[in-house]
């Protein structure tokens, strides 16, 4: 079967990606920053293996991926991590792997990717999620149709949300800044 590494598994994009990956039969690996977040994922996704959850705060996830895949690497990476964690994520890809970058930090910083990565015939793609709003109507309609189909089939389900009243906007920003939130704020 195919495998995927999804970084920041308890964020909104990460949670949705894990759900979709399982629905399509992928072997899922993910990263989180705390044991609390790891436990949250294990409760939410009983099919997720504890040993497939790595640390998003350093590059130790690379060793975990290579051990768990017996040196093969994963078929897909959904990346939102930066700097040395970006480079480690690239190294996690197997032959002809596909890398999907959704973080802006390294793009805006013009971080270099070594050409040796392409010896494994890798594919790199970037998605600027905020630019989807200005995408052509044909693309937005196609995405909407795909999402509607996955909602009807039960693949896509509502995400965990933390809603704050307007009077607690400061607390909401503090939660976001702390990195302790799970799901959408």
Question: Could you say what each language-model-derived stretch is?
Answer:
Residues 1-184:
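4′-phosphopantetheine-dependent carrier domains
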């Amino acid at each position: 079967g195919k495998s995927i590494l999804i970084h920041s598994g308890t964020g909104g994009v990460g949670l949705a990606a894990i759900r979709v990956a399982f629905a399509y039969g992928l072997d899922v690996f993910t990263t989180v920053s705390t044991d609390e977040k790891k436990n949250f994922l294990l409760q939410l996704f009983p099919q997720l293996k504890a040993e497939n959850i790595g640390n998003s705060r350093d590059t130790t996830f690379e060793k975990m991926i290579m051990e768990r895949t017996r040196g093969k690497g994963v078929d897909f990476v959904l990346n939102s991590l930066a700097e040395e964690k970006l480079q480690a994520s690239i190294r996690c890809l197997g032959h002809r792997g596909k890398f999907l970058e959704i973080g802006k930090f390294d793009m805006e910083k013009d971080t270099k990717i070594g050409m040796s990565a392409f010896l494994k015939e890798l594919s790199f793609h970037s998605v600027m999620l905020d630019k989807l709003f200005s995408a052509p109507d044909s693309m937005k309609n196609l995405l909407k149709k795909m999402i509607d189909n996955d909602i009807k089939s039960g693949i896509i389900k509502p995400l965990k949300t933390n809603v704050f009243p307007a009077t607690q906007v400061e607390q909401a920003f503090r939660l976001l800044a702390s990195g302790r939130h799970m799901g959408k704020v």
